[in-house]
């Protein structure tokens, strides 16, 4: 036996190729869904974040009969990608335009590359990208793969043509081993849920069976886009600080550094923080020792008077668009939504939005249907391990007037943040961070109070209607007695008069109470003798 271990290192590309399930590529069905998601989310980030109304086309075609290989294409009308970054954006794991403090769907710089790595494991065609940045005179195209060992793009083809039409946007096609029958319901669910939260987008979807579904744009109103912000002092650590300091000019002082590089820090606040850390405000920041850096971080984390992190970096959907999306999809009897005030955790701002829909076309079931969203991404898998589920499970709906055994209820929760605490790189569930959990609970409770008012009104109306229906039951008997009275007992005249009286009385009550045909049928089924 040898006690010698062999040590080597691997590239990030190699790591995700070896562990595709960490990024959501655990089997062909899931991979199909995940690859589609990554492309659609990039397409949406390239549009609404830049105030472009999204038009997204998704096409899945089967290309091989022997193996289940599919060609997945997603086209957008977004800002496009500068040609010099295309190879790295699609061929270098952990390369992104989204490593800044601003709410976007993308966060890790991994998604599309994880899809490419999965793609090239089971078939040999490269990914194809066609793109034109805004105002570009040319349209660029690339075919590439990833060199897994070096974590670098390998370019197979590149070219460009004139852009005479002012086109801008990106089209990406990739070939992947999939399992359509197993992926189908999740893929459709994903598109439906994406549509609910982006009613200002239009989608065209063609599935591999040839079915085409169009999701029309419901409104031209778009959420206010997020702005990039500086870090908040509560969110720093020693490594981040060192990294930021390494980019400063040599003569930048500690005070200047704090004021220039962080949000919520003016001169006065900077001086108080530096005093708390026991440092000299005029010292050059690059000269701070490790010990001094550690003291500065402690002071920044514990200083009590910073303004909370700026919500400008966030982009909520807003109650009206949430209601629009829910109405369109579920045709409910009741819909309501709230956008909570901004809160913060670990130096990151976050906002919770909650939408509730009840009754109408919603299929009743033992548990409410929960729609989870983070930064406008629908989360479909791993529902039960999500903090949203944990909170929803604890809600006692009876307190809000919902007595049904089977609930016709949809609960939608949207978390916006510059950092969503996902449990994995596949972005399917949110970890239970205390501050977020509390805010989700408060959001659901706030939205439920309006639902309760609606339920109370509805119950009152139902009770009043029931009482009145009971009165209605007496009409035939009353009409009969009156007809005998009016006709002085002339038996041959009585039935006709009785019918006339009865119809008039019914008309009167039906009009007054706005009784629907269904209830009228119910009334007609009553017999005096059953009273
Ligand atoms: N359709 C597109 N339009 C514009 N830019 C795009 C498009 N697709 C990809 N990109 C660029 O490529 C980069 C890398 O995308 P990728 O999916 O790998 O990671 P990400 O979106 O940054 O983060 P995440 O891993 O969280 O999805 C993006 O940050 C974006 O700049």
Swiss-Prot record:
Its EC number is 5.6.2.2. It holds the Pfam family Topo-VIb_trans. Coiled coil: none annotated. It catalyses: ATP-dependent breakage, passage and rejoining of double-stranded DNA. CDD domains: TopoIIB_Trans (cd00823). Gene3D superfamilies: 1.10.8.50, 3.30.230.10, Histidine kinase-like ATPase, C-terminal domain. Relaxes both positive and negative superturns and exhibits a strong decatenase activity. This is Type 2 DNA topoisomerase 6 subunit B. It comes from Metallosphaera sedula (strain ATCC 51363 / DSM 5348 / JCM 9185 / NBRC 15509 / TH2).
């Amino acid at each position: 036996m040898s006690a010698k271990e062999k040590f080597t290192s691997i590239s990030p590309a190699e790591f995700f190729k070896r562990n595709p399930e960490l990024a959501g590529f655990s089997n062909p069905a899931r991979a199909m869904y995940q690859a589609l998601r990554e492309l659609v989310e990039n397409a949406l980030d390239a549009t609404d974040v830049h105030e472009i109304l999204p038009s997204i086309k998704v096409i899945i075609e089967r290309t091989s009969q022997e193996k289940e290989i599919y060609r997945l294409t997603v086209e957008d009308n977004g800002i496009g990608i500068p040609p010099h970054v295309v190879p790295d954006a699609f061929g270098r794991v952990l390369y992104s335009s989204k490593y800044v403090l601003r709410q976007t769907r993308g966060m890790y710089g991994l998604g599309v590359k994880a899809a490419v790595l999965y793609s090239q494991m089971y078939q040999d065609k490269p990914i194809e990208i066609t793109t034109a940045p805004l105002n570009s005179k040319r349209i660029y195209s690339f075919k590439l793969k990833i060199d897994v060992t070096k974590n670098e793009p390998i370019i197979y083809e590149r070219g460009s043509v004139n852009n005479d039409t002012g086109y801008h946007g990106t089209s990406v096609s990739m070939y992947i081993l999939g399992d359509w029958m197993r992926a189908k319901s999740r893929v459709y669910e994903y598109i439906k849920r994406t549509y609910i939260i982006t009613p200002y987008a239009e989608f065209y979807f063609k599935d591999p069976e040839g079915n085409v579904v169009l999701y029309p744009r419901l409104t031209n109103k778009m959420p206010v886009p997020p702005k990039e912000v500086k870090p908040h002092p509560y969110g720093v650590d020693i490594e981040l600080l060192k990294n930021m300091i390494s980019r400063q000019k040599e003569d930048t002082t500690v005070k200047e550094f704090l004021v220039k590089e962080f949000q919520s820090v003016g001169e006065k606040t900077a001086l108080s923080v530096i005093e708390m850390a026991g440092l000299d405000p005029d010292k050059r920041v690059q000269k701070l020792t490790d010990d001094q850096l550690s003291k500065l971080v402690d002071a920044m984390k514990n200083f009590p008077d910073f303004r909370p992190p700026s919500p400008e970096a966030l982009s909520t959907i807003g109650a009206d668009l949430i209601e629009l999306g829910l109405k369109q999809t579920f045709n409910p009897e009741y819909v309501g939504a709230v956008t909570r005030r901004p809160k913060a955790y670990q130096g990151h701002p976050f906002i919770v939005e909650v939408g509730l829909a009840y009754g109408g076309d919603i299929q009743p079931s033992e548990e409410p249907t929960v729609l989870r969203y983070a930064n406008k991404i629908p989360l479909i898998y791993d529902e039960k391990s999500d903090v949203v589920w944990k909170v929803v499970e604890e809600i006692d709906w009876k307190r809000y007037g919902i007595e049904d055994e089977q609930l016709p209820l949809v609960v939608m929760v949207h978390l916006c943040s510059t950092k969503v605490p996902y449990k994995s790189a596949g972005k399917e569930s949110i970890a239970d961070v205390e501050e977020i959990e509390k805010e989700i609970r408060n959001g659901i409770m706030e939205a439920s109070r309006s639902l309760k008012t609606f339920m109370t009104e509805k119950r009152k109306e139902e009770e009043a209607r029931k009482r009145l229906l009971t009165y209605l039951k007496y009409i035939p008997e009353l009409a009969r007695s009156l007809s005998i009275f009016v006709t002085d007992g002339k038996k041959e005249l009585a039935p006709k008069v009785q019918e006339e009286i009865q119809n008039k009385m019914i008309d009167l009550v039906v009009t007054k109470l706005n009784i629907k045909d269904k209830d009228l049928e119910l009334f007609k089924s009553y017999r005096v003798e059953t009273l």
